[in-house]
């Protein structure tokens, strides 16, 4: 009897340990910025949980890893708690922020709410946080998937996907970005980086992959 109880206790400990490990790997570190942000392989070697998250978004949304990661870089510089600067009242006093954007993907409140609602309708009731890399990268994949459907954009068209991401679907249709030279320049940077990231990723994804990776996806 004692041996049976001991065995069950050990199994419980093992299960809890595996669950903790999975959570740690998939969530990744939400406080530190990658040491080599220009090299996606370096990022994934440093933060393997991010590799798993980006690969999961690719499989789920058919989202090229290079594009997804380039969006995150452009939006937050890989800062988990990034937020827009505050406006200045009378040019001096810190005032309200320019938008409700928060986290890695700089998702605003309304769009994040829609993303969570869609996930729940699909049966995914896990809590979602904009400071969680797994959730943020999945959000980018979801958003770009919506852009493909609504705007008929190619999943590999990083520039126009980013313009739609920044301006919103209606804003993109109204071509509001045409009056924003700085935004077009940013979209060009996203496109260039996405292309470089994708080339890097294709060279290292096999080395980074493990046979048991499928067990780590929730």
What label would you give each PLM region?
Residues 28-89, 145-152:
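Export/targeting segments at the very N-terminus of extracytoplasmic proteins
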Residues 2, 90-93, 211-218:
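Short, aromatic- and cysteine-enriched interfacial helices/patches
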Residues 96-99, 156-208:
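Catalytic and substrate-binding regions of cell-wall glycan-acting enzymes that process beta-1,4-linked
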Residues 104-160, 164-172, 190:
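Alpha-helical segment that forms one wall of the substrate-binding/catalytic cleft
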Residues 1-29:
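Sec-dependent bacterial lipoprotein signal peptides
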Residues 87-91, 181-184:
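Glycine-rich, phosphate-binding/catalytic loops in enzymes
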């Amino acid at each position: 009897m004692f041996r049976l109880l001991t065995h069950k206790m050990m199994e419980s400990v093992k299960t809890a340990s595996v669950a903790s490990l999975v959570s740690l790997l998939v969530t990744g570190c939400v406080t530190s910025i990658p040491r080599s942000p220009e090299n996606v392989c370096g990022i994934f070697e440093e933060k393997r949980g991010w590799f798993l998250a980006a690969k999961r978004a690719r499989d789920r949304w058919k989202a090229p890893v290079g594009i997804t990661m380039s969006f995150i870089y452009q939006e937050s510089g890989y800062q988990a708690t990034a937020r827009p600067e505050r406006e200045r009242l009378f040019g001096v006093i810190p005032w309200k922020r320019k938008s409700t954007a928060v986290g890695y993907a700089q998702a605003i409140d309304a769009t994040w709410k829609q993303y969570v609602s869609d996930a729940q309708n699909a049966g995914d009731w896990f809590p979602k946080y904009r400071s969680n890399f797994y959730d943020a990268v999945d959000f980018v994949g979801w958003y770009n998937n919506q852009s493909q459907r609504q705007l008929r954009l190619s999943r590999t068209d990083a520039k126009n996907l980013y313009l739609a991401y920044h301006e919103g679907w209606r804003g993109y249709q109204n071509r509001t970005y045409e009056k924003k030279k700085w935004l077009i320049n940013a979209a060009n940077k996203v496109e260039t980086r996405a292309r470089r990231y994708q080339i890097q990723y294709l060279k290292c994804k096999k080395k980074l992959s493990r046979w048991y990776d499928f067990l780590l996806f929730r």
